[in-house]
Amino acid sequence: MSFTPRTARHTPFERRTTLMANTVIGSSIVIDGEISGDEDLVIQGTVKGKISLKESLYVEGSGVVEADIETQNVEIAGRVTGNIVASDKVELKTDCRVVGDIKAPRILIADGASFKGNVDMDMKER
């Protein structure tokens, strides 16, 4: 029996977000705690706790987040368990899984995305 290593195949979303972000949490990294910052963040690994960013968060297909999220924009292709508050937009990509409430003025849910929770798009708080 021979072993042939498989190379990682990244979707166009994953290639684009990895190139755009200043900070990437790799697929073998696990963080338990609070993350805060002023720049974009890509999560390919696992984050538990709380995430607070002034810019955008990208959760790639391999990413697992068990945290409340507060940021400007969120794009999710992986799994998120926790409440999401975005000042601009939340986008759930095909095959993502999200469990928690979403509060944002704009929300996009792709065909094939899984979402369980409540949505609040209250325009008064913009």
UniProtKB/Swiss-Prot annotation:
The keyword Translocase does not apply. One of its GO terms (cellular component) is cytoskeleton. Disruption phenotype: BacP, ParA and ParB-parS are less organized forming smaller, more dispersed patches, PadC still forms foci which are mislocalized. In a triple bacN-bacO-bacP deletion ParA, ParB-parS and PadC are also mislocalized, nucleoids are more compact, DNA origin regions are mislocalized, DNA content increases. The triple bacNOP deletion is synthetically lethal with smc or double scpAB deletions. It is found in: Cytoplasm, Cytoskeleton. Pfam families: Bactofilin. The keyword Iron does not apply. Its main location: cytoplasm. GO terms for biological process: chromosome segregation. Coiled coil: none annotated. A non-essential component of the chromosome segregation machinery. Positions the ParA-ParB-parS chromosome segregation machinery within the cell; BacP seems to be the most important bactofilin in this process. Forms a heteropolymeric, subpolar scaffold in the cell; BacP probably forms the core, BacO contributes to position and integrity while BacN does not seem to contribute to assembly. Belongs to the bactofilin family. Interacts with BacN and probably also BacP, the 3 proteins colocalize as an extended structure. Interacts with PadC. This is Bactofilin BacO. It comes from Myxococcus xanthus (strain DK1622). The gene is bacO.
